[in-house]
């Protein structure tokens, strides 16, 4: 198939699945749009404002600001000069001191280090106003200053007088301190900086006295060099600074939000996309669907390309919507008002592509969906954190640091948003013409390139990890480059050599059991010394050991073995699912480790567990895999129709696989394996879970298809193996025990003949045994299970067989025999003997079982070992049963059991608990604090030389009057000075302010960079005014402008060589000043809280993993059915989760201590932090429990919860925080939103932490400034500092704590109502009002009923009260309708009674309604109509009382994988109320009786399917339940385990219990059931004991014979002719190659006579084996059933066929099958069962057609003790 066609097919698959997963698709598309809507909302609530031209007044610098005159000091300000050895400097400093009216103390320090030490350590350093440090080495104390003077002004680290209100508590608008590390603000805006401050505002050059001191020092220097001239100059000279005028502009407060919040919101919006992508890819990997597609011919690169195109197109839609929201103007504004729409789209699309590839990369590191999804989301968030390090120190970061940071796509995205916001602030927006403009050393173009580079790198990592590293699933790729590396080769074979020694000495002893290879057959599969070893930590498990065997074309090779023998491992190795540890396997000459791509083109695989897409229909699956295997479009449709017909799935063609029953899924899996003509078929238990009719259809299909194929089949059905297997191989503990044809194995392991007897309840076992031993003394009782007894009859006693059979037939009623039959050695017996020989411990264990031991000669059966499962199971020291706990004692015991379950989950999933619940929130906080603290250290104020060269080349406009009174050459000197400094002087005429306004309007983009300072020298009469004009957009322009005019004045006085260079070098930070960082710490608190909320979202969602997991596997339902109370179940979970929540809470406090985060680590704050966290846990955990009801799998639930909690936590906090900004003017809206969002625990948590942080920091700020409470609140402009942090008002946390405390009980109540189905019941009442009439019509449609069924219903109807009192279980007219678009009738007025010591069997095809009955009896599904009573209690109204009387084994194991088998039993024992002192004994006895002791203490996840079924059955039998419901209890068990379970169930029934069982095994029902009913389309078609049904519907015998295949063609026809001649009236019922099945009429024909005839025929016609039995229950079952529409799996789909049941015009009864018996049964039992008018479509054409006079078509009969018996075995019922 061409790659393009495969790609098209994969895209079709992906989009069909996305279309049918509506919620996930909507979430993926809308989550980014929702976050975009938040940004749009903020935009619409922060409208831009127009500002007119503004001129600012000049500021006199000759005097200190007024603040210093009123500053509250206990001592004088200090002026410090350095070095102190110079008297010259002291004189200069004293001149400075005399300049001002403030009283100063002049101090000198010898060195800078001593000065800094004084500042840091001495409390008196607070009074140091400034330190003046001259850069000159004075050789003597009187040495004068040089003409070139350089000095530092060292003001305090934190400004003293710039107490500007912390207007932006949550966003950083300006850098803290003197900002000497920056020339411009990091977030430079088009709007004027500090618009309302004439002196420029922050960093406070005027208010701090810097300009006054600078000018005073400059003036003192001038006086030092030219005392007289300087005095004369300054007499008529006034120097001032003046801010550049502001032109008309738009003041847009949203730009602050855009730059600070938009990157975070954009990242959070795409994190949901990343989670969904990762989860989608990993689900395919976890379910092995990905490897299955590879096996069917898919190339790896196509898989990734298809996924990329799928998510790319989804992202295209999402990004288009986001672009529209961002760029479309609403109310005259848009999020990006000025930017190019195309560029915004390209930018977002590049980020979306990078996110897709990031998800691809993360998916390659994991095998489990929910683990990979959670960790992928965490890592995605972590990659955003470096941006916080970059953004606040952008100008300090090197180009390499920025490039490396942009290797994280989230950082690159945030950098891109930064550029967009900067260009938006300039008023131009990002455009094609300016996208390459370098801002600092980076540009928007580089951001786009880095996003594309990130995508490539992520893709490369994904490719390398996918290709080169070994995985648990799939073959690791071998690249020759890495193959040269010895280390790589070593890793390829991680098996210890001693384990792989070839040539096991024991294999020589097994050679007798390995048949010679057949001659003349093509060897298609060759396995040579194959090993597979699995490692779990330090332990290892050899799954396959030295396996060598061949498989041949045209043959079916059957692989048998006990659960865990290694069958599935062999299949997985051959299909390439897992690599072999050592050895080789060749398929059609290709080695599996090297040529898997070629092999897969010819292999069809049906895995043990269905690998189906939940939302694909049957037709979709066949079409997809057919096309993938290379079928053309036309051929594919033809093959699909053919396959649907062959498999009997026509009516299921449009049903989604998730709604199909297990049997139908197995059919579909077989169809997928067969489609497109695969030459090699590997079928792993293909018929598991199928009903008898379906299984026979598959047998026919496989025999038809095997001609040119090689088939490897595994199974637990021995009859299937005997019938289909050309060769049979048996594995035990991974080793091959025997291999050969069925006849070869029977010959090697045979022990004679087997007689199977099915007893009636009145049978006298000892009397019956005496009769048998009388005829054959050497007979051995092989097993006794329930109603079944199996005797081994030695071959040498064969002459006595006829007399024995005649005697039993004549005395059948007297001896209490229901049916009996005999056969030669069966495959089941072969299997059991092989297992015993391979594992002697099995033999020892089974010898302990009374039903499996040889009966002693006196026929006495010991009874001391059969007490543990009946009513005296708890009577450990006496015959009196103990009392179960009740009331409060039971509640406490259940609470304890549920608490231990939670503890076990945490202990066994410690990695999950440690990573998600503990480390994740702590690591996020630690990383955030590390970034902020690192930033604080790196942003310490550094020395900055205040010269124009610092800002590069600028234009300096100046105005100097002609013939200035200062100096006629002033203009020339000024120009020369600027040129020498590398600047561009520009002399203008007229007003400098007007010139600047004009230039700012002409070129707004370049103005702030080109025009930093200006000067004006004006003469007014005899007075000169010098104005130093500065551009306030530059932090240090005021001092630069002053230095410029001071320097030109100095040059006028002292010559052209004179110059003064001033450096701003802040003092080191004192301990006191550390507390004055609120302006800087505010943004830190905001981002800290946002990051923390994200981590808490993951922590909170993790509490859903167990609850969703229990719900998905129905373990929770089983626990409730066992009797656990709602309070015990949920409150125990809440308690443990709160304890778990306390651990990260306390560790969080330690983290705050470690990082010295006083706001949270202060002694007064610690109780508040703990209280906030615990109340949040109290509220959020019940909410998570409640929401978890909506999820089906833990992985998807965790993903959706993270998305939901992130959105509902961060979005409200951001909205309330942003709208609370004073500049926006929406404080009332903020308060309203704050109160609305109190219903969300995440919002309460975030706001409580925010207020706790800001309140503490503001209090520190005000205390440092010595401000009173009133003054502090005035400065804060509306923020009220709370002395009591628990206050309700602004910056208090009281209302949030109160809300959290109230939300806890509210959500708990909501949880209990949800658990009690209160909302479902309400919905049902409301919807039932409208559809009641339709349902009544549907339920009134009934088919013809059998007389026994009618009699049972009438008896219940008229004697209901009596039956309720006497019978443990009474079901009256129980009905179930699934209310879909087309109402589906699953159960139609079923009535039956089950008495004590009865085992009632429900038989029927897949979907007949059996499980629906169980679901109603256990209240897993609501009852549509009817009633059911258990011990007199109605399950509709008294379910809480009913629970204590019911034991339940569900169809699919509801076991908790993280617990051991023993722990599961102990937990359910506590739930049942067994006293603690008896639990251990009780559990030990059950484990011993079911042979579970070996693996009782192993985790359930290590159990095989069969062992899980044993454990599920044990749970159902535990605790003395009166009514036990077993839904297919023995499915998937090997024969040994199956017999043990039958034995246990039989003895439980004998003890007086009531059992209801469903099964697809007729032998199981024959062995266990005292009464049974056959269901067809929701109705009972017959009801009664097995013997009663056989008496009514059939008589005669069933003959099965198998001709040796060597003489198959020659002798088969002769034998058929012999039967027709010898038994007149016989009919051929079934034929499968060498096996035939006949119906023999019972008139004048004795069983013993038939046996005698067949013994002779065995010799004459070379029969391999044969069996004779009375007519079986399976014959009757098949007569009532045929392939019919499956009701159960179409619950969600609704079948059109049922439409007719709603139509009054349609008179055909919905539940009456075409093959149902007549509505009026005959007055006397018919001589034979009713036949079907036609055979199933899967029957081979070679079979004789059935005629109306013939008996029903019957399958090969089997050993009655097991559904896995060979065809030679009688089926006795």
From Swiss-Prot:
GO cellular component: endoplasmic reticulum membrane; intracellular membrane-bounded organelle
Gene3D superfamilies according to UniProt: P-loop containing nucleotide triphosphate hydrolases (3.40.50.300)
Keyword Chaperone: no
PTM annotation, UniProt: N-glycosylated.
Organism annotation: Rattus norvegicus (Rat)
Gene Ontology MF: a single term: ABC-type transporter activity
Entries under SUPFAM superfamilies matching the protein: P-loop containing nucleoside triphosphate hydrolases (SSF52540)
Family according to the record: Belongs to the ABC transporter superfamily. ABCA family.
Residue span, ABC transporter domain: 525-758, 1369-1602
Compositionally skewed regions (Pro residues) per UniProt: 1711-1740, 1763-1773
Keywords: ATP-binding, Cytoplasm, Endoplasmic reticulum, Glycoprotein, Lipid metabolism, Lipid transport, Membrane, Nucleotide-binding, Repeat, Transmembrane, Transmembrane helix, Transport
Record InterPro entries: AAA+_ATPase, ABC2_TM, ABC_transporter-like_ATP-bd, ABCA, P-loop_NTPase, R2_ABCA1-4-like
UniProt subcellular location: Endoplasmic reticulum membrane; Cytoplasm
Name of protein: ATP-binding cassette sub-family A member 17
Ligand binding (ATP): 561-568, 1404-1411
GO BP: any one term: lipid transport
Purpose: Promotes cholesterol efflux from sperm which renders sperm capable of fertilization. Has also been shown to decrease levels of intracellular esterified neutral lipids including cholesteryl esters, fatty acid esters and triacylglycerols.
Gene name for this UniProt entry: Abca17
Pfam family, one: ABC2_membrane_3
The UniProt record lists the keyword Kinase: no
Residue numbers spanned by region Disordered: 1690-1773
Biased composition (Low complexity): 1700-1710
Bilayer-spanning residue ranges: 22-42, 262-282, 306-326, 342-362, 372-392, 403-423, 444-464, 912-932, 1088-1108, 1134-1154, 1166-1186, 1198-1218, 1236-1256, 1293-1313
Membrane topology per record: Multi-pass membrane protein
């Amino acid at each position: 198939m061409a790659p393009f066609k495969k790609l098209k097919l994969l895209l079709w698959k992906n989009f069909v699945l996305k279309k049918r997963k509506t919620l996930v698709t909507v979430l993926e598309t809308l989550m980014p749009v929702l976050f975009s809507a938040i940004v749009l909302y903020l935009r619409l609530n922060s409208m831009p404002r127009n500002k007119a031209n503004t001129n600012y007044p000049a500021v006199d610098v000759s005097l200190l600001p007024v603040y210093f005159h009123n500053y509250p000091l206990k001592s004088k300000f200090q002026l410090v000069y350095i070095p102190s050895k110079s008297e010259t400097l002291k004189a200069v400093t004293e001149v400075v001191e005399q300049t001002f009216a403030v009283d100063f103390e002049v101090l000198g320090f010898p060195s800078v280090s001593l000065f800094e030490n004084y500042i840091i350590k001495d409390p008196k350093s607070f009074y140091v106003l400034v330190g003046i440090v001259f850069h000159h080495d004075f050789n003597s104390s009187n040495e004068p200053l040089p003409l070139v003077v350089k000095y530092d002004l060292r003001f305090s680290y934190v400004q003293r007088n710039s107490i500007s209100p912390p207007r932006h508590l949550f966003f950083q608008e300006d850098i803290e301190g003197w900002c000497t590390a920056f020339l411009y603000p990091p977030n430079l805006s088009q709007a004027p900086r500090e618009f309302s401050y004439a002196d420029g505002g922050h960093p406070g050059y005027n208010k701090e006295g810097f300009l006054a001191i600078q000018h005073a020092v400059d003036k003192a220097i001038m006086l030092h060099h030219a005392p007289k001239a300087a005095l004369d100059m300054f007499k008529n000279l006034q120097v001032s600074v003046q801010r550049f005028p502001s032109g008309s502009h738009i003041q847009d407060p949203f730009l602050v939000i855009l730059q600070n919040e938009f990157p975070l919101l954009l990242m959070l919006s795409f994190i949901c996309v990343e989670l969904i992508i990762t989860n989608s890819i990993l689900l395919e990997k976890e379910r092995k669907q990905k490897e299955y597609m590879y096996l069917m011919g898919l190339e790896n690169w196509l898989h990734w390309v298809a996924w990329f195109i799928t998510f790319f197109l989804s992202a295209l839609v999402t990004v288009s919507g986001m672009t529209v929201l961002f760029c479309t103007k609403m109310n005259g504004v848009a999020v990006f008002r000025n930017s190019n729409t195309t560029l915004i789209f390209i930018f977002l699309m590049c980020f979306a592509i990078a996110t897709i590839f990031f998800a691809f990369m993360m998916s390659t590191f994991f095998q489990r969906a929910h683990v990979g999804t959670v960790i992928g989301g965490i890592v995605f968030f972590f990659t955003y954190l470096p941006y916080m390090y970059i953004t606040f120190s952008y100008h300090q970061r090197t180009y390499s640091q920025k490039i490396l940071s942009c290797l994280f796509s989230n950082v690159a995205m945030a950098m891109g948003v930064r550029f967009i916001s900067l260009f938006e602030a300039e008023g131009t927006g990002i455009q094609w013409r300016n996208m390459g403009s370098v801002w600092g050393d980076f540009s928007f173009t580089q951001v786009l390139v880095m996003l594309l580079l990130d995508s490539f790198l992520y893709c490369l990592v994904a490719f390398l990890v996918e290709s080169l590293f070994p995985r648990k699933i799939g073959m690791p790729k071998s690249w020759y480059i890495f193959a040269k590396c010895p280390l790589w080769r070593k890793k390829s074979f991680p098996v210890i050599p001693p384990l792989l020694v070839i040539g096991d000495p024991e294999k020589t002893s097994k050679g007798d059991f390995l048949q010679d290879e057949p001659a003349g057959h093509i060897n298609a599969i060759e396995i040579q010394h194959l090993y597979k070893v699995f490692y779990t930590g330090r332990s290892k498990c050899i799954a396959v050991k030295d396996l060598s065997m061949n498989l041949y074309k045209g043959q079916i090779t059957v692989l048998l073995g006990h659960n865990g023998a290694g069958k599935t491992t062999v299949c997985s190795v051959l299909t390439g699912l897992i690599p072999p540890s050592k050895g080789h396997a060749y398929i059609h000459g290709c080695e599996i480790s090297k040529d898997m791509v070629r092999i897969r083109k010819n292999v069809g695989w049906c895995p043990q567990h269905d690998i189906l897409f939940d939302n694909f229909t049957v037709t979709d699956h066949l079409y997809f895999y057919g096309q993938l295997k290379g079928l053309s479009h036309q051929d594919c449709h033809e093959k699909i129709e053919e396959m649907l017909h062959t498999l009997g799935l026509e009516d299921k063609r449009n049903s989604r696989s998730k709604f199909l029953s297990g049997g139908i899924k197995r059919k579909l899996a077989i169809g997928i394996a067969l489609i497109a003509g695969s030459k090699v078929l590997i079928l792993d238990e293909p018929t598991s879970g199928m009903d008898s009719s379906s299984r026979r259809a598959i047998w026919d299909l496989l025999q038809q298809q095997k001609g040119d194929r090689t088939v490897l089949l595994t199974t637990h059905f021995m009859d299937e193996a005997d019938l289909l297997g050309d060769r049979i191989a048996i594995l035990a503990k991974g080793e091959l025990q025997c291999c050969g044809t069925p006849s070869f194995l029977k010959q090697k392991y045979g022990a004679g003949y087997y007689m199977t007897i099915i007893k009636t309840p009145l049978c006298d076992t000892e009397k019956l045994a005496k009769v048998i031993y009388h005829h054959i003394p050497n007979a051995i009782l092989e097993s006794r299970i329930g109603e079944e007894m199996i005797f081994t009859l030695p071959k040498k006693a064969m002459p006595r067989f006829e007399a024995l059979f005649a005697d039993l037939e004549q005395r059948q009623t007297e001896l209490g025999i229901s049916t009996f039959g005999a056969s030669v050695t069966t495959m089941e017996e072969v299997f059991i003997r092989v297992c015993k020989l391979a594992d002697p411990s099995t033999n020892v264990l089974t010898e302990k079982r009374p039903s499996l031991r040889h009966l002693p000669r006196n026929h006495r059966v010991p009874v001391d070992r059969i007490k543990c499962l009946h009513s005296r199971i708890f009577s450990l020291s006496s015959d009196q049963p103990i009392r179960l706990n009740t009331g409060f004692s039971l509640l406490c015991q259940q609470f304890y059991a549920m608490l231990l379950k939670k503890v076990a989950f945490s202990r066994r999933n410690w990695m999950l608990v440690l990573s998600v619940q503990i480390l994740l929130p702590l690591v996020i906080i630690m990383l955030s604090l590390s970034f902020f603290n690192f930033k604080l250290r790196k942003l310490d104020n550094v020395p900055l030389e205040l010269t124009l060269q610092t800002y590069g080349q600028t234009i300096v406009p100046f105005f100097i009057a002609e013939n200035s009174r200062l100096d006629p050459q002033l203009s020339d000197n000024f120009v020369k000075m600027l040129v020498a400094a590398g600047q561009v002087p520009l002399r203008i005429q007229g007003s400098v302010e007007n010139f600047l306004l004009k230039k700012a309007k002409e070129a707004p983009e370049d103005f702030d960079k080109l025009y930093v300072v200006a000067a004006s020298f004006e003469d007014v009469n005899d007075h000169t005014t010098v104005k130093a004009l500065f551009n306030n957009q530059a932090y240090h322009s005021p001092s630069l402008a002053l230095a410029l005019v001071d320097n030109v004045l100095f040059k006028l006085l002292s010559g052209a060589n004179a110059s003064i260079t001033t450096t701003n070098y802040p003092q080191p930070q004192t301990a006191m000043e550390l507390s004055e960082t609120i302006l800087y710490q505010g943004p830190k608190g905001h981002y800290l809280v946002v990051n923390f909320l994200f981590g808490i979202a993951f922590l909170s969602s993790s509490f859903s993993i167990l609850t969703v997991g229990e719900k998905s596997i129905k373990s929770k339902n089983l626990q409730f059915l066992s009797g656990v109370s709602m309070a015990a179940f949920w409150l125990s979970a809440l308690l443990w989760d709160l304890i778990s929540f306390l651990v990260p809470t306390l560790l969080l406090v330690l983290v705050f201590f470690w990082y010295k985060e006083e706001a949270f680590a202060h002694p007064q704050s610690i109780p508040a932090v703990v209280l906030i966290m615990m109340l949040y846990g109290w509220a959020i955990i019940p909410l998570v429990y409640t929401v978890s009801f909506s999820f089906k799998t833990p992985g998807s639930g965790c993903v959706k919860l993270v998305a939901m909690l992130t959105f509902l936590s961060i979005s409200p906090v951001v909205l309330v925080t942003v709208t609370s900004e004073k500049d926006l003017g929406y404080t009332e809206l903020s308060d309203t939103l704050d109160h609305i969002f109190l219903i969300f625990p995440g919002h309460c948590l975030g706001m409580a932490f925010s207020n706790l942080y800001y309140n503490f920091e503001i209090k520190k700020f005000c205390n440092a400034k010595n401000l009173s409470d009133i003054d502090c609140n005035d400065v804060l402009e509306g923020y009220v500092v709370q002395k009591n942090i628990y206050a309700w008002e602004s910056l208090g946390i009281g209302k949030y704590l109160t809300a959290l405390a109230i939300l806890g009980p509210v959500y708990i109540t909501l949880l209990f109502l949800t658990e009690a189905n209160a909302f479902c019941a309400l919905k049902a009442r409301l919807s039932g009002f409208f559809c009641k009439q339709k349902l009544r019509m549907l339920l009134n449609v009934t088919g013809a009923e059998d007389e026994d069924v009618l009699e049972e219903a009438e008896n219940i109807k008229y004697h209901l009260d009596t039956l309720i009192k006497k019978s443990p279980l009474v079901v009256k007219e129980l009905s179930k309708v699934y209310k879909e678009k087309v109402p589906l009738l699953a159960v139609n007025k079923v009535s039956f009674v089950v008495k004590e010591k009865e085992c009632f069997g429900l038989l029927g095809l897949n979907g007949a309604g059996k499980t629906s009955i169980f679901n109603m009896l256990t209240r897993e599904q609501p009852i549509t109509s009817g009633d059911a009573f258990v011990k007199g209690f109605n399950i509709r109204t008294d379910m809480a009382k009913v629970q204590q009387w019911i034991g339940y084994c569900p169809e699919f194991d509801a076991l908790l994988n993280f617990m051991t088998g023993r722990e599961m039993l102990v937990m359910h024992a506590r739930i049942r109320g067994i006293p603690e002192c008896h639990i251990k004994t009780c559990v030990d006895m059950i484990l011993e009786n079911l042979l579970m002791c070996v693996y009782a203490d192993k985790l359930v996840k290590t159990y095989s399917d069969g062992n899980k079924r044993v454990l599920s059955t044990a749970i159902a039998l535990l605790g003395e339940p009166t009514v036990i419901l077993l839904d297919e209890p023995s499915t998937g068990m090997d024969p040994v385990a199956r017999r043990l379970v039958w034995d246990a169930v039989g003895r439980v029934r004998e003890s007086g219990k009531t059992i209801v069982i469903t099964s697809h095994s007729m032998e199981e029902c024959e062995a266990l059931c005292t009464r049974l009913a056959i269901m067809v389309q929701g109705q009972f078609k017959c009801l009664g004991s097995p013997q009663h049904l056989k008496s009514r519907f059939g008589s005669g015998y069933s003959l099965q014979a198998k001709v040796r295949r060597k003489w198959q063609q020659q002798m088969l026809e002769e034998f058929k002719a012999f039967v027709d001649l010898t038994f007149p009236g016989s009919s051929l019922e079934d034929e499968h190659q060498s096996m035939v099945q006949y119906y023999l009429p019972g008139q004048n024909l004795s069983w013993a006579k038939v046996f005698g005839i067949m013994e002779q025929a065995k010799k004459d016609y070379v029969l391999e084996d044969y069996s004779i039995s009375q007519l079986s229950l399976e014959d009757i079952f098949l007569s009532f059933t045929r392939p019919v529409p499956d009701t159960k799996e179409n619950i969600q789909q609704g079948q059109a066929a049922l439409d007719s049941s709603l139509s009054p015009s349609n008179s055909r009864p919905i539940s009456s099958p075409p093959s149902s018996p007549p509505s009026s049964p005959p007055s006397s039992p018919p001589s034979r069962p009713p036949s079907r008018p036609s055979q199933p479509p899967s029957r081979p054409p070679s079979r004789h057609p059935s005629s109306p006079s013939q008996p029903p078509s019957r399958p090969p009969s089997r050993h009655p003790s097991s559904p896995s018996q060979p065809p030679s075995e009688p089926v006795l019922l």
